[in-house]
Amino acid sequence: MGQKIHPTGFRLAVSRNWASRWYANNNNFAAMLQEDIGVREYLKKKLKNASVGRVIIERPAKNARITIFSSRPGVVIGKKGEDIELLKTELQRRMGVPVHVNIEEIRKPETDAQLIADSITQQLERRIMFRRAMKRAMQNAMRLGAQGIKIMSAGRLNGIEIARTEWYREGRVPLHTLRADIDYATSEAKTTYGVIGVKVWVYKGDTLGRNDAPVVEEVTEDKRPRRNARPGDRRPRRDGEGGAPGARRGGPRRGAGKPEDGKTGE
């Protein structure tokens, strides 16, 4: 089950949170969800070169707050803040409410699953060998603190006639452990041969809930009680037991008392 289910949806109630954080009644839910999907698609195209990892949309009291996580915040803001003002105006036109845009910097882009997937797809579109791109991304992630990473590519890899799937893993990726912080993302590379899909799982350690607090490993002793050696606790030895280490137990060897051929006892 842990291998098939979406890692983020599997951990929503334990260690992950929603990307859209708002409440709506049955009449408005579909329209607001469609707005969120349109906003994410627009930001993905508009900020294609800004290395955007994720987008969080909140709707407090007839307003909208959009938080963009990017490893290159300067590209999003633009010269003297011109680009972000144009972005805010377009988002207000699309959503119909006042929009506040916040930019958060991703400190380690090499361990962000979405940025890893986007980087691999960009290399595939530039005709770089998929194995080289995948292994380089895995090495960078492990070097910067990831405890495990798994990358899967599927499609007409290297332009072959028959599509296939290849994946590589390094370290641990416990998909069925709920407290494990698994960052999962997908991306698509549109090549001349067709579409190649890329999936990335990054294991960053265990957490204690949605605040991303790391788990402190405690040293646990053996729970089994040790028996105190007492003089009368040992069971008595039976005949033939004991002796020097390596000594054979039991009776005499078979044929030990018989004389050898051609020899008789005197």
Curated annotation (Swiss-Prot):
Record's compositionally biased regions (Basic and acidic residues): 230-241, 257-266
The protein's name: Small ribosomal subunit protein uS3
Residues covered by region (Disordered): 214-266
GO cellular component: cytosolic small ribosomal subunit
Subunit structure: Part of the 30S ribosomal subunit. Forms a tight complex with proteins S10 and S14.
GO molecular function: mRNA binding; rRNA binding; structural constituent of ribosome
Gene expressing this chain: rpsC
Keyword RNA-binding applies: yes
Family: Belongs to the universal ribosomal protein uS3 family.
Statement: the UniProt record of this protein carries the keyword Ribonucleoprotein: yes
Function: Binds the lower part of the 30S subunit head. Binds mRNA in the 70S ribosome, positioning it for translation.
Any Pfam family: Ribosomal_S3_C
GO BP, sorted A to Z: translation
Keywords from the named record: Ribonucleoprotein, Ribosomal protein, RNA-binding, rRNA-binding
Source domain of life: Bacteria
SUPFAM superfamilies, per the entry: Prokaryotic type KH domain (KH-domain type II) (SSF54814), Ribosomal protein S3 C-terminal domain (SSF54821)
